[in-house]
Amino acid sequence: MFRFVQQSQLRKAWVPNQLVSASRNSLHAQNSLRFNSAAAVERTAETVGGGANGYGGSGDAGAPLDRAVNKVRSMRRGFKLGKSFPKPPSPESPWYHKVCAFDEYVASSLNAGNETGSAGWAKSQRATMFWDSITKAMNLYRELLLSQELTQARVSRLLSLLHLALKINRSNMTGLNKKPDYDSQSFHKTMTNYLYASFKEISQDVLNGQVTVAHVGAFHLLESFRELLLAEEAVLLWRTATASEKPGLVAPFMHPDPVGIMLPLLHEGGMTFEEVSALYEKCKKGQNPTALHCLTLGMIKVCLSAGANAEAVGLFQEICSLPGNSVSKATLTGIHLAFIGECKDLQLATVFFNRALSGETPYKMNIHVSSVKQLLQNIWDQTEDFEQVFDVWRRASNYYVGLSSQGIFSSLNSKFFEIFFQKYRNDKVAGMQHLMEIITGYNEIRSVDEPFLNIILTKCVVWKDLEIIENIEESYQIYQLSKSIVSCRILLKAMGCVEVSNEQIYSRWLRLVQKADQIGQTYIANADWAALRDATVGYIHQNQKEEHADSPENLATSYPDYNPALEAANASGAFDSDLPFGEHGNAIKKHIIATDDRSELYFRMVKKFGQYCRDSKQLVRITRGITESYPFTKEYSDNFMSMDVSDIQMPKLVNLRSKSQLFASYF
């Protein structure tokens, strides 16, 4: 047909040493006002423009390391740490040694964070010490709650440190070639959850009056919740604090900086534009204009959201008219990005986007991919002009070439192809032709890689065409790419959108299990079981839904440990060596699966391979646990233990560990 041309539970007291050691993986920190996206680099005019063919433009592949050196340095310089270092306690205090240790851990970690841009820092002992000091500081914080030594300054500096750690951890995740499995005990996942638990703990202590914070601490606390995509928790914290009668609690949360964080969140939560404006004026009154940057940024975002573009431009002009270097780079960048991504006036948004691309700004501009994605969505929502969407995507891709991690491209491409398949949902012939052109053109910008094809493969299932899926699979070989376990999961999962035999699904499942074994997994992960589920019972469930009402195709995948902080990383694929299917592919016989009932196939596979579950809880979750979402599977679940699977072949496995005793404790 077509062929291509070319929130989990953590022990609060500690983080395992082996996970701290994992922090030696590269840290590409960045200054980001958004959760999952920044390419903090300086660009030359040559790297911005496209070539004559409309796709051209390639970055300097050797320059990113030097540019990355300044990422966290820039971020660290812009951090609000407070002007005064906490006054040391009296040597006669019984808490003296613990307070000194607390101050030392916080200070040394903040200093280490300032060095994360250096080329050798990520692999040095200091990287491990940075994360270890954070956990030790939190342990001492809990012990010092009984004392009177946790001053506003100390608590605020601790929150500054935790916020910096959150940014560094997020930057690491953005730089990964592959996002962690949702059931894996990855360092990034563990630290994200640990940091969230720490923020939550301190916020409760603040509200309970056990500790107080300065406005700097309130800023970092609220901003951290926002960056974790936990707007409701930020709003609840702010409303509770500002309505409190406890002394010293209202003032720091009503300071212009924390309120600047809250204005857009409050507006999104239902506060009217007039009410937000009144709060803005209240906080602004009597303040030095040079101290209102964060507040003004928040109000500009609200104006753009409400369509008050003239007011937003006026506020921006006020900021730009302030003298000298009184306005931080982070503020100017944040305002510029707000106009790109949050302005509904496409002409105005495009002007800001073009100026950022060309460097025609009096300040250094770093375009965050989240703002570009918002612009793409706004263009499509308002005009459905795909050519305009394509133009912005192409130019943004040229901008990021050689300057950004894989996660940035995966995030941008995911949004672009989401829109692409909306346009061509009902015209796969024209869509496939255009897709071939896009892939060829993209290969001129940067080499087609596995994550790029994974995204296409994931989204092309709306066409429900097995031949297209297989042709896309062939493109991995065309572009000389090895399929990782992520690709194997996607291919199995895609079987839930097309008419295929159980024999074909079984074949895909065996390849996935063998791949898991080949890369060293010791148990079959949740993501692997989810792919099997979506290919089998998910297929039946979707057909039942379509029989009752027309509904958009949405091949859903749920993970029990879903975490927005991980999801925001949005990078898929890894460059593992591929595993040949081998003899087992040829040995499959039609009588292995006696029926084409996909529900029965699912439970038979679980019965055969369930011995490779992580534990009994996982086994119960993938059997009895799915009956609530898929009631039609209850019959099979009830008869699960009596199923005969002796006719199903078991491939030779090396690393997966059999736990046959799981079935003994199943009941």
UniProtKB/Swiss-Prot annotation:
Residues 1-12 form a transit peptide. Phosphorylated. Phosphorylation promotes binding to RNA. Keywords: Membrane, Mitochondrion, Mitochondrion inner membrane, Phosphoprotein, Sporulation, Transit peptide. It is a peripheral membrane protein. It is found in: Mitochondrion inner membrane. Its main location: mitochondrion. It comes from the Eukaryota. One of its GO terms (cellular component) is mitochondrial inner membrane. The keyword Phosphoprotein applies. One of its GO terms (biological process) is sporulation resulting in formation of a cellular spore. Monomer. Binds the 3'-UTR of mitochondrial mRNAs. Involved in the processing or stability of mitochondrial mRNAs. Belongs to the RMD9 family. This is RNA-binding protein RMD9, mitochondrial. It comes from Eremothecium gossypii (strain ATCC 10895 / CBS 109.51 / FGSC 9923 / NRRL Y-1056) (Yeast).
